[in-house]
């Protein structure tokens, strides 16, 4: 399936139906009086978070969504039917932004969330509504109100427990493939990964979701390489696994390059809990491994994990370290939910 993480969409709610001008006509009833019904409301525009989606690709092929108009009122005091609603179905993690791409209108993070974006126009009054003591046979009715319209942006930020960051060719996709059932493209050249990938990790009978994003290079926040737009997909992660290629020229400099991009991006990524790991250690001599480990430790100011996704060495330890941080975050969320839980006085 192709991946698309943002789309511009036009939405319009339905117009209200017009009220009806009608009079009661029956045998032996000379002055039946007005009986025009009201118009129906226009359809609303909803957005709903559904299961089974992880891309916005459907909105590449259809960008215009219009709800149905309300039906007009009819005689015998019959009101028009409400117009059919239109529902935009999106994956969990989708944000709805105004046309300025800054104002957040909705943030859908849980399956089943449903938010009304636009309300349909009200139906017009039929002439029965205008009957008064001084005007027993009004010949006027209201038209329905127009619906609302706007352009919106849908932006997907994948929901994962842990995220993989690093320079291109740091071994992120290999790590994802080794620890999950995901099958990312793996090759020995930069930017093999062109869009984010998700996988479910199982360790010690537990599960968590791991996200792999395309590699960052120096100047990514200014648009270099693939830029930093994909960093939005790890904004919701509790912990980052920063992989540094052990075969690169200088592990410390490689680490600092990515850290600078995280700081430049903002969004609190630089403050996320970070686990640092030196990858591809099976390709290093003992002397070079020691040198790269020391360089990385000085740059990160913490002891890095050592792993090889190919041989599996050090991988279980990295997964358990991620799981420990994720569990801590989940427990904190549960504790916070208990604090705010409503109780009768």
Swiss-Prot record:
Localization per Swiss-Prot or TrEMBL: Cytoplasm
Predominant location category: cytoplasm
Keywords: Cytoplasm, GTP-binding, Hydrolase, Magnesium, Metal-binding, Nucleotide-binding
GO biological process, one term: ribosome biogenesis
Residue positions binding GTP: 166-173, 191-195, 212-215, 279-282, 308-310
Assembly notes: Monomer.
Protein family (similarity comment): Belongs to the TRAFAC class OBG-HflX-like GTPase superfamily. OBG GTPase family.
Function: An essential GTPase which binds GTP, GDP and possibly (p)ppGpp with moderate affinity, with high nucleotide exchange rates and a fairly low GTP hydrolysis rate. Plays a role in control of the cell cycle, stress response, ribosome biogenesis and in those bacteria that undergo differentiation, in morphogenesis control.
Protein name: GTPase Obg
């Amino acid at each position: 399936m192709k991946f698309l993480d943002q789309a511009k969409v036009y939405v319009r709610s339905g117009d209200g139906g017009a009220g009806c001008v009608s009079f009661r006509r029956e045998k032996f009833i000379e002055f039946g009086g007005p009986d025009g019904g009201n118009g129906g409301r226009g359809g609303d525009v909803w957005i709903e978070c559904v299961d089974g989606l992880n891309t916005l690709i459907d909105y590449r092929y259809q960008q215009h969504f219009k709800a149905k108009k309300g039906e007009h009122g009819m005689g015998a005091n019959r009101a028009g039917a409400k117009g059919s609603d239109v529902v935009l179905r999106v994956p969990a993690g989708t944000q709805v932004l105004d046309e300025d791409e800054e104002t957040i209108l909705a943030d859908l993070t849980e399956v089943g969330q449903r938010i009304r974006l636009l309300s349909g126009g009200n139906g017009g009054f039929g002439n029965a509504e205008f009957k008064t003591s001084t005007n027993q046979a009004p010949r006027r009715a209201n038209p329905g109100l127009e619906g609302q319209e706007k352009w919106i942006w849908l932006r997907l930020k994948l929901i994962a427990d842990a995220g993989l960051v690093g320079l291109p060719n740091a071994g992120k996709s290999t790590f994802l493939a080794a620890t999950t059932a995901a099958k990312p493209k793996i090759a020995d050249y930069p930017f093999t990964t062109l869009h984010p990938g998700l996988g479910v990790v199982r360790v010690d009978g537990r599960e968590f979701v791991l996200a792999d994003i395309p590699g960052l290079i120096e100047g990514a926040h200014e648009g270099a390489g693939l830029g930093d737009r994909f960093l939005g997909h790890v904004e919701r992660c509790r912990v980052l696994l920063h992989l540094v290629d052990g075969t690169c020229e200088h592990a410390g400099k490689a680490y600092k390059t990515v850290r600078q991009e995280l700081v430049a991006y903002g969004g609190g990524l630089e403050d996320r809990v970070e686990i640092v790991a030196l990858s591809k250690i099976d390709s290093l001599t003992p002397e070079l491994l020691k040198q790269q480990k020391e360089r990385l430790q000085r740059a990160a100011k913490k002891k890095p994990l050592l792993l090889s996704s190919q041989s599996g060495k050090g991988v279980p330890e990295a997964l358990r370290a991620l799981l420990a941080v994720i569990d801590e975050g989940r427990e904190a969320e549960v504790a916070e939910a208990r604090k705010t839980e409503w109780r009768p006085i």
